[in-house]
């Protein structure tokens, strides 16, 4: 049941010494991957999402403004183009914010649900690499939802339902954890409290059990971690954030 062996045996994916941590998808793997992408687009369209695509590389100034440079630079790949420093994106969020800021919006447009299958790169230590579970390049299923404060609870519940629908289809079991403010974070205590309260309120209305994971939130916000079990009973994490 080792997925790395199955990947080769079934012609799904492989890894090469020329690119450690960077998966090569084979013909059968692309058939499966494209079917999953088609399904992703179908369910997101039904849920009221629009789809965008943002560049895999953006200038370093953006990463300073977003806070990623101060909190995540050791995990980022960088380069210089025409004397301007750039970085491969480790997360899709800053690009998604640029798209939103590119045109004016009215409160009547909200909630605005935006989905992206963005390719991200993260400098993982070689000893931590493990098949497709821990890689240096992967496609991240991301959603950025722009909303008013009074819409937060319903939107979080909507995301949780979408995740539950997908996991149920594939027969995954999961449990939820609420991860709160870490020591290394941006934003004020008041902003963190408001965001955390929104997640707690939504979780309570969902009526499903969850545990609180103190101090394990992202540096930019609290999050709900969906821990699912694979066929070997190992725990994997799917993250949903406000």
Question: What kind of region is each of these model predictions?
Answer:
Residues 80-83, 147-148, 229-233:
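Short acidic-glycine loop/turn motifs at beta-strand connectors
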Residues 235-242:
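Residue-level detector of conserved catalytic or cofactor/ligand-binding positions
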């Amino acid at each position: 049941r080792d997925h790395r062996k199955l990947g080769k045996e079934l012609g799904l994916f492989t890894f090469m010494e020329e690119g450690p941590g960077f998966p090569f998808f084979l013909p059968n793997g692309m058939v499966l991957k494209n079917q999953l992408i088609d399904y992703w687009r179908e369910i997101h369209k039904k849920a009221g999402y629009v789809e965008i695509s943002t560049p895999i590389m953006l200038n370093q100034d953006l990463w300073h403004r977003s806070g990623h440079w101060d909190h995540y630079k050791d995990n980022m790949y960088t380069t210089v183009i025409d004397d301007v420093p750039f970085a491969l994106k480790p997360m899709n969020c800053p690009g998604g914010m640029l798209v939103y800021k590119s045109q004016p919006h009215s409160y009547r447009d909200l909630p605005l649900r935006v989905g992206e299958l963005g390719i991200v790169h993260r400098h993982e230590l070689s000893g931590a690499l493990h098949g497709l579970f821990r890689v240096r390049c992967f496609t991240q299923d991301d959603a950025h939802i722009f909303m008013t404060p009074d819409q937060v609870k319903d939107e979080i519940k909507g995301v949780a339902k979408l995740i539950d629908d997908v996991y149920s289809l594939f027969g995954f079991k999961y449990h939820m954890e609420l991860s709160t403010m870490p020591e290394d974070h941006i934003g004020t205590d008041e902003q963190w409290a408001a965001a955390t309260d929104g997640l707690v309120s939504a979780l309570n209305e969902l009526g499903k059990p969850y545990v609180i994971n103190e101090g394990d939130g992202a540096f930019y916000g609290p999050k709900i971690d969906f821990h699912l079990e694979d066929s070997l009973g190992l725990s994997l994490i799917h993250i949903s954030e406000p």
